[in-house]
From Swiss-Prot:
The modification N-acetylalanine is found at residue 2. Residues 1-26, 38-63 are annotated as: Disordered. This is UBX domain-containing protein 2B. Keywords: Acetylation, Cytoplasm, Cytoskeleton, Endoplasmic reticulum, Golgi apparatus, Nucleus, Phosphoprotein. Belongs to the NSFL1C family. It is found in: Nucleus; Cytoplasm, Cytosol; Endoplasmic reticulum; Golgi apparatus. Residues 141-206 form the SEP domain.
Amino acid sequence: MAEGGGAEPEEQERRSSRPRPPSARDLQLALAELYEDEMKCKSSKPDRSTATAFKSPRTPPLRLYSGDQEYGGLHIAQPPTGKIVNELFKEAREHGAVPLNEATRSSSDDKAKSFTGGGYRLGSSFYKRSEYIYGENQLQDVQILLRLWSNGFSLDDGELRPYSDPTNAQFLESVKRGEIPLELQRLVHGSQVSLDMEDHQDQEYIKPRLRFKAFSGEGQKLGSLTPEIVSTPSSPEEEDKSILNAAVLIDDSVPTTKIQIRLADGSRLIQRFNSTHRILDVRDFIVQSRPEFATTDFILVTSFPSKELTDESVTLQDADILNTVILQQLK
């Protein structure tokens, strides 16, 4: 009896030391880990159906593209040696940044596209998800350069914007989320924006020297209180098509300026005015050029930052809108 009693606890101990069969919970965890490993392997392989198919002998920059016609497009490019605002680039990368061939940045074969191939349509908010779009839908209208300095950032050749300013912090937060900043959305009604980022973290802001840009086509110089239009028609014929002089009397003895007007329907007008013309003259020009707005109640606002031009008796020079873009908004 004593020996039998001693053997029974040993048998129970051997049974308890045997591995128990896996439960349903164990199987679920194992499958989840297997799935995660498989997805990591897939994500490490280039997908030829997206912009990652564009390769470069060197480490390519990162670029994020948004082709939403309502909110415009957003490109984020980081130079290979970039060390600035690592978190900014990291979070942008998480919202769809893809490597692109550096050569596509300087290609001028197709003026309507900044690169060939697909990109990502970025949501304008948390609720609007990003999605892949194809190259034929990528349009470019306004190109903006965001330079990140050690003491702030600048847009194109504009003034320094300190990081400590809450408005500027909000701008960068939108970029980090892969969204088009609100102040740029106001510029792209019916068109698109290309936003490139340059790394200057090791330098303090350097005010650029004024210079003329020799290129054919249109663009905008952003960053000051109001953007400047940089427009160089490739031929007199094109200039005649883009600038309507019939509706406005020009005094050649007085300085002139070009105003681009983005209409509420998404179209735009470019007109040459004297600096002494008034805001009311701009309104009259819109109505003469587009009679359908004669019975429409609308306002005129500056584009960057947005400010309503309430006093229409003010001259264009006094309103500080020479060589700028103004927007028509329906009431």
